């Protein structure tokens, strides 16, 4: 009889105001006192002194630190094997690029990875995969769930609002992704892990029920970040991204191929979640309320996104992951989604012809 499976969870999980200035103490408590630091482009000037002072005060030795602006897998392999042998951890501070680069470098060297996101734009900071350029093509490659996640809500608050909107879009996508996963199992094309469903569902429900006056409220940001972190754990349990990535993500990935300059991942995903929630006839009022009340739609209306691009993306979606069987893998639901793009009142307001 199979007892169960082993899974990794973060040993360090610190999300709150001022967390970045306490990073040294968090690392020292785990005996991670020899580290390599990677900062996102321009972030040494913004956060370098705060981080270095915290590490120095707690006698955590920085073996080397650099700014990174690449997700090319060849660059990262070279970087990984230049990490000193006595390093005990790799730390990435910044956005998606440097998080993915550091995560993969740590994976190659079998070192603990500490994820320190400076924006809330997606759940990538907590995921066990990295989005890298492989022979010029954006590719999701396996890595490992972060050993530590440290997020300073004050840092998140001072980032441009578009990153918060992106995080909101990525978070609510769990509503449609979970429904796709269950739909897939019913079609005989996959197997749902009930515990992963529970974790992902609890994450999104905790977020969408949070009271707030502003999207920069401490409680709102903490709930958003907590929930994004839980999403990564749901994927780890499932052994895939199915609990958090469904038809709405396929639309976004298709838009990445169609658009010369794609929008932030979570912005595209948020719009696609609204479309798919209506197609699925599943919790679309909740999705609509969150997007309206947070100001997400007002932001989207400034982006001049085109209806025609979404129509193309819906048709392209099944080819992005042909092994899946989401709602969009069936023609009748693709047609329903396209009809919605053409006729829905909200989409008519925020998308252009």
Which role fits each region the language model picked out?
Residues 171, 282-353:
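C-terminal charged capping/lid subdomain of soluble metabolic enzymes
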